[in-house]
Regions:
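Active-site environment of divalent metal-dependent phosphoester hydrolases
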Residues: 11-16, 41-45, 69-70
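Short, Lys/Arg- and Gly-enriched loop/turn segments at beta-strand edges
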Residues: 159-166
Length: 176
């Protein structure tokens, strides 16, 4: 069976008692990891909490679904040749108004999950680090701080804002 469900809830039929669809199939496949876009736009906080409860902390992967307009000012951008309007943290297709991805980075998605969606810090950190590495078969090199693994570390302040980035054991960004 499937071992990974991309962008759970996004552009898929809803979970129903008569037709559980992708969500039900992912739940019933014991090794299936599920991705959640926790930018505060794509999925309601109660659905995020329910998904953690339903699948367990070890099967949820936080993703950003960020497009290249992430970090840019409000305005019009393109994605796959389509015009996209960015306003605040929302990116929509100019034609039709559908969500067109996210303009929130992964660190902020994790912060939103903890601060605004009440996901426990330990669960959110695992979903943003260990679980993605396990999902793609790279946990032997990435996803945790262990001797012999690649030295990539993000340091966060108590409010979960970025403090420092260490890549391959070298400090590449440090903020006072």
């Amino acid at each position: 069976g499937a071992n990974h469900a991309t962008h759970l809830y996004n552009a898929m039929p809803p979970f129903s008692h008569r037709a559980p669809g992708v969500i039900g199939a992912a739940h019933d496949s014991a090794h299936c990891m599920v991705e959640l876009i926790t930018d505060g736009v794509h999925i309601h906080p109660s659905v995020v909490r329910t998904t953690f409860d339903m699948f367990g902390d070890d099967r949820v992967v936080l993703i950003s679904d960020s497009m290249r307009a992430t970090g840019m000012p409000d305005g019009e951008y393109t994605l796959g040749g389509q015009a996209v309007q960015v306003r605040g943290n929302r990116a929509t297709l100019v034609e039709g108004g559908a969500l067109a991805g996210s303009v929130t980075n992964l660190a902020d998605c994790m912060r939103v999950a903890v601060k605004e969606m009440q996901i426990p810090l330990e669960s959110a950190v695992a979903a943003a680090t260990m679980n993605p590495a396990k999902s793609v078969g790279l946990y032997d090199k990435y996803g945790s701080i262990t001797e012999g693994k690649v030295g990539n570390v993000v340091l966060l302040r108590e409010d979960l804002s970025l403090k420092a980035v260490i890549q391959n054991g070298r400090v590449v960004r440090w903020e006072e």
